[in-house]
Amino acid sequence: MAQRAGTPTLRFFEWQPWAISLGHHQKTSDLDEGRCKADGIDIVHRPTGGRAILHAEELTYSVVMAAGRKSILQVYNDISRALIRGLALYGVDAALQKVQPNFSEEYRSPSSVPCFNSSARYEIEWEGRKLVGSAQRRFHEGERDVVLQHGSILCGPAHMRLVDYLAVTDPAVRGQVRLTLTEKTADLGMITGKTVEREKLAACLRRGFEEAWGITWEERSVPKNFMHKGAGLP
């Protein structure tokens, strides 16, 4: 990844089979592993932080780039604005979250296990509801920093099924998590009232980066051996 960071790299992909990814430091014990296995839901750990996501009806994006002199939030903001421009081209008016929540307090609650139960600063929302969940990590390569940022763009409501795979035995807690996800998330299908055209969406997002960053992407195929590394990550 670091070797490719001389040129920014943008990828879009979907998950088959569906999978739950956990943040780098999140415990697998947060999940009901038996039920995940029975339903054919893979479990992976991301190299980035954050909380659990059920990768189902979504389009996942991944950006690898040199950080330069920019801070984590500056890079996050740059990528988010490009995504917002792409979503606008698709016909969706999204916005940035302006306030950073106190995650040290939020993570004490059992309802904090799902990523989409809260929005960080510069994450993308629609009418106050989280539409894109993202995470970033920096890797040191000699004297430079290389950024990996990836995220889930919700296309349908299947992400809410994550509640069924949590290691939560109290029905009241499970119900609260489900309610919070319902109230705090939005998906493109719900917003547009139509089935999301993934290829069209990816094309709009690609163009959004080009317009926001003043660049032109060069399309390249992904090496076959790369597809077998990291359980589909980044």
For the regions a language model picked out, list residue spans one by one.
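Short acidic-glycine loop/turn motifs at beta-strand connectors
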Residues: 16, 56, 126-128, 143
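Internal, conserved structured core segments that host functional sites
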Residues: 60-121
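Short, solvent-exposed loop/turn segments at the edges of secondary structure
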Residues: 56-58, 119, 148
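Short helix/loop capping segments that flank catalytic or ligand/cofactor-binding pockets
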Residues: 21-23, 30-32, 132-133, 157-158, ...
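A glycine-rich, hydrophobic loop/mini-helix early in the fold
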Residues: 30-71, 204
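N-terminal low-complexity, intrinsically disordered segments
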Residues: 1-47
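Aromatic/basic-lined ligand-recognition segments
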Residues: 114-136
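Long, positively charged amphipathic alpha-helical accessory segments at protein N-termini or as interdomain linkers
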Residues: 84-110, 137-234
